Design a protein with these regions (language model features):
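Alpha/beta-hydrolase active-site loop
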Residues: 2, 30-50
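Accessory cap/linker subdomain of secreted extracellular hydrolases
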Residues: 86-194
Length: 278
């Protein structure tokens, strides 16, 4: 419950917090990241009608994909005075997923380095097909062709058999025909980040195996218009949920008692106090 911890902490410090965590399940199935951004805009519109909120500095805090939502809104809406990202994304989804494949496989120790390299290269081939296709049907056609070709070749290792199994193909097809996933494969964070005119705090975990904190913070720094209030932090021994961790593996998330590191809350508050005073 990291969002509860953040909301509670900031509320106690005098900040008005509105949590916008998830769409209802039935709506989410047909929604994309841009729909989530439109939802934020509707919330901002409702704030503008409230005399107790309309004149206050307004910002967005997004975790993981939520950072993409914050970037989209901040790029197009001048009402956004600051953005905070946790485990934030500046890379394309293809690059994020390739990092995940490599990092999680490496942490598990179940594959040899050569097998891990094969898994990454095979995944890259598939992700490139989706990202470069002009429609889900076009992507599905090319993926079917790829799997048909592979089924006619000699499979020489377990990793090849796993990557090109019918179960894996079914997973890929679910991604292709998911409006959310397909849209993410065609989303370019750089385009939106370059248009942001507000300060950003980007906080990532050193052992985040889902989003590479060092790489994405460097891209944020490169893409954002210059602002002395920008701040980029990598928290030592922290995972994607910014918990203190051992390996960073998603398997650890549910067994770590800590909800969110206290130093992350301190960084957020300290930066916010500075950002809203300017």
């Amino acid at each position: 419950k990291p969002f509860l911890a953040i909301a509670d902490h900031l509320t106690r410090q005098g900040y008005a917090v509105f949590r916008y965590d998830d769409f209802p399940t039935a709506v989410f199935a047909k929604s994309t990241t841009y729909d989530f951004a439109d939802g934020v805009t509707m919330i901002l519109d409702s704030f503008a009608k409230r005399p107790d909120l309309g004149s206050l500095p307004t910002g967005l805090l997004g975790h993981s994909e939520g950072s993409l939502v914050a970037e989209i809104v901040a790029a197009r809406d001048k009402r956004i005075d600051f953005v905070i990202t946790l485990g934030g994304v500046a890379q394309t989804i293809s690059d994020v997923l390739l990092y995940q494949v490599h990092a999680i496989n490496e942490a598990s120790g179940e594959l040899t380095p050569e097998e891990n390299d094969y898994a990454v290269e095979a995944s890259k081939t598939i992700y490139d097909i989706i990202a470069k296709s002009k429609s889900p049907d076009a992507a599905a056609k090319k993926i079917n062709k790829l799997y048909s070709y592979q089924s006619g070749t000699l499979i020489t290792s377990k990793i090849e058999a796993d990557v090109f199994s019918q179960n894996k193909k079914a997973e890929i097809m679910q991604m292709v025909y998911s409006p959310w996933f397909y849209t993410l494969f065609h989303h370019q964070p750089k385009k939106h980040i370059k248009k942001m005119r507000c300060p950003m705090l980007a906080v990532g975990g050193e052992k985040d195996l889902q989003v590479d904190a060092v790489t994405n913070n460097a891209l944020f720094k490169a893409y954002l218009p210059k602002n002395p209030l920008h701040r980029f932090e990598v928290i030592p021994n922290a995972n994607h949920l910014l918990q203190t961790c051992t390996t960073g593996s998603p398997d650890e998330y549910g067994i770590i008692e800590e909800t969110l590191r206290g130093d992350v809350l301190e960084i957020i508050q300290e930066w916010l106090d500075s950002a809203v005073s300017h």
